[in-house]
């Protein structure tokens, strides 16, 4: 088989759909026993390990909203969960609230995270934003 240059490989990737690229990455990971996400996790852990935790917190742009507990007003919390998490039915929202602590929103901006936290706390839930 002829060796392809980097430019030729990039041109081939540009022709592929996202689904095809996703399948390619999965096969690549299995074939070479690697994960594409490993360098990102190491890079993210670097600043925190270096003692710059305050700087890392200021630069954070994605937040997770975690439901810690429903409190005494479970029905109100279920209603708010359905409002915040799109596409949830009543049963799914109830199961989510019953199985707390659970993440409700992941990788959202600060405004959305604070808004969700305020609504959930107003309904009686205990919530953390990370």
UniProtKB/Swiss-Prot annotation:
Instruction: Give UniProt keywords alphabetically.
Output: Ribonucleoprotein, Ribosomal protein
Q: Which GO terms describe its cellular component?
A: cytosolic large ribosomal subunit
Record keywords: rRNA-binding included? Answer: no
Q: Which positions are tagged coiled coil?
A: none
Gene Ontology molecular functions: mRNA binding; structural constituent of ribosome
Q: What Gene Ontology terms for biological process does this UniProt record contain?
A: translation
The answer to keyword Iron-sulfur applying to this record is no
Known role? Forms part of the ribosomal stalk which helps the ribosome interact with GTP-bound translation factors. Is thus essential for accurate translation.
Which HAMAP family does the record match to this protein?
Ribosomal_bL12 (MF_00368)
Describe the protein's quaternary organization and the partners it interacts with. Homodimer. Part of the ribosomal stalk of the 50S ribosomal subunit. Forms a multimeric L10(L12)X complex, where L10 forms an elongated spine to which 2 to 4 L12 dimers bind in a sequential fashion. Binds GTP-bound translation factors.
Question: Sorted alphabetically, which NCBIfam families does this protein's record hold?
Answer: L12
What family does this belong to?
Answer: Belongs to the bacterial ribosomal protein bL12 family.
Name of the molecule in the record? Large ribosomal subunit protein bL12
């Amino acid at each position: 088989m002829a060796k392809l240059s980097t430019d030729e490989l990039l041109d081939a990737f540009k022709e592929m759909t996202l689904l095809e690229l996703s399948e390619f990455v999965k096969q690549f990971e299995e074939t070479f026993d690697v994960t594409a996400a490993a360098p990102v996790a190491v890079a993210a852990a670097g600043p925190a390990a270096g003692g710059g935790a305050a700087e890392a917190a200021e630069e954070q742009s994605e937040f997770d909203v975690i439901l810690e507990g429903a409190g005494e007003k479970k029905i109100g919390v279920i209603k708010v969960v359905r409002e915040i998490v799109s596409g949830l039915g009543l049963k799914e929202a109830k199961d989510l609230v019953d199985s707390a602590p659970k993440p409700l929103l992941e990788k959202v901006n600060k405004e959305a995270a604070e808004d969700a936290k305020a609504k959930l706390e107003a309904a009686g839930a205990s919530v953390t934003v990370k």
